[in-house]
Amino acid sequence: MLAKDRLEGMSSSTTGGASTAYAAELTFALTLADRADAISLSRYQALDLEITTKPDNTPVTDADKSVEAAIIEAITAQYPNDGIVGEEFGSRGDKNRYWIIDPIDGTKNFLRGVPTWATLIALVENEKVVASVVSSPALYRRWFASKGGGAYVIEGVGLSGTGSDAIKDLAGTAKRKLSVSKVLQIADASIAYSDFQGWGARRASFEKLLDSAWRSRGMGDFWSHMLVAEGAVDVAIEPSLALWDMAALDLIVCEAGGKFTSLDGVDGPFGPNAISSNGLIHAAISAALNGGK
């Protein structure tokens, strides 16, 4: 049976009790992640990796460009009327329904041989993320969600060289449904952050927040937010992000029962920064970060 048929035939019990109108798009996004993983893994720790510097002084590798180009090619063939927003090759097409691509989130980790990097893929319709995939083959994990369909993780992705098991097992037992934590107070919370740079006027409030938490760790990038979705971390905060850094994360966190906003509390991934949390302590985190502004 084809992956598309398997997903569209899933009962409400296998989708967490909710049907989804975006089953076909989610399955397609998973095939995009398969293609991305095959390219990125083939270039990970490659001795001939090509690295250049973009105008914003951030690095880009030949793997970033190859992954994004492959995803664009596939989207254009499958959904020719959809728009595309990519980190490396810019924007094109429809602004009511478009795909957002971060070919390798964590490029600095990728080029140094640190396994914390991923391909982020999201579909936006009428300014709402409706399907998303975060695939991290070097960590052997893939997270995915569709609007109203819940959020899941497949573990073991990448062990065979591709992520095809995520599709094969989508209607089976290998996927694990995600649910955020139930922590109610900052004093009991585990907080993940990117780094100490970029906080500007919020720097003092940021440091005070970390001091008041039960635990804090500098993880950063997609990894922090996926741990929020898994319930392993209660809060993830980052002071400066682009849309392609956040779009795929937003839906997965929210479908796991959490909340995703800008530091100023605006819902969704369209601000310049992000807080993701279990939702229960979101207001307290936002207030704490804005106290020193």
Give the predicted meaning of each segment.
Residues 94-157, 161, 165-168:
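DPxDG-like acidic metal-binding loop motif
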Residues 40, 64, 75, 107, ...:
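Residue-level signal for inorganic ion chemistry
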Residues 91-94, 126, 183-185, 268:
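Short, flexible hinge/linker loops that cap or flank conserved catalytic cores
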Residues 1-104, 160, 165, 280-291:
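N-terminal subdomain of lithium-sensitive/metallo-dependent phosphomonoesterases centered on the IMPase/IPPase/PAP
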Residues 170-174, 178-293:
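An extended, acidic
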Residues 65, 69, 88, 103-106, ...:
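Generic detector of well-ordered alpha-helical packing
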